[in-house]
């Protein structure tokens, strides 16, 4: 019985870095003269890849678009990445770790980066709310289960 439990879970954050960054204010400077009542859209995406045995890169892409009516006030995109050493887990647990736990670790860094970029663009402060990556991952699993077998034919 003890031989089955020899594989101990190991999770270690090796590095956090900004992989890509972009800030655009296509309608500046006249956008600064308008009443600031923006519609803010937040898009999130994650990707992961295995770099070596038990070593993974996870990239969290955060895109924020602020619009005033039909005009884009600013578009900000950050790809915050991390290198993680993960062992002792497999299957759904590994997918959850790469798709929820790691992005949870990266989001505060991406949020800070976006806040700084928006501020340097001289726009009013933008405070992004925390994101529940566990809930997003569960929704993703439910969508995959609902779509089920028909999508496997496309592969």
Swiss-Prot record:
GO terms for cellular component: cytoplasm. It holds the Pfam family SecB. One of its GO terms (molecular function) is unfolded protein binding. Keywords: Chaperone, Cytoplasm, Protein transport, Translocation, Transport. One of its GO terms (biological process) is protein tetramerization. InterPro entries: SecB, SecB-like_sf. It comes from the Bacteria. The keyword Cytoplasm applies. It is found in: Cytoplasm. One of the proteins required for the normal export of preproteins out of the cell cytoplasm. It is a molecular chaperone that binds to a subset of precursor proteins, maintaining them in a translocation-competent state. It also specifically binds to its receptor SecA. Belongs to the SecB family. Homotetramer, a dimer of dimers. One homotetramer interacts with 1 SecA dimer. This is Protein-export protein SecB. The lineage of its organism: Bacteria, Pseudomonadati, Pseudomonadota, Gammaproteobacteria, Enterobacterales.
């Amino acid at each position: 019985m003890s031989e089955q439990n020899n594989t101990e879970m190991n999770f270690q954050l090796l590095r956090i870095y900004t992989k890509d960054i972009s800030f655009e204010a296509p309608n500046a400077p006249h956008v600064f003269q308008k009443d600031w009542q923006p519609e803010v859209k937040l898009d999130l995406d994650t990707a992961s890849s295995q770099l070596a045995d038990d070593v993974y890169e996870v990239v969290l892409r955060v895109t924020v678009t602020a619009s005033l009516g039909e005009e884009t006030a600013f578009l900000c995109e950050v790809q915050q990445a991390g290198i993680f050493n993960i062992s002792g887990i497999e299957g759904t647990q590994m997918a959850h770790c790469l798709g929820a736990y790691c992005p949870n670790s990266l989001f505060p860094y991406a949020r800070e980066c976006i806040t700084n970029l928006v501020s340097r663009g001289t726009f009013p402060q933008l405070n992004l709310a925390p994101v529940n990556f566990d809930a997003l991952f569960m929704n993703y699993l439910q969508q995959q289960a609902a779509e089920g077998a028909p999508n496997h034919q496309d592969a």
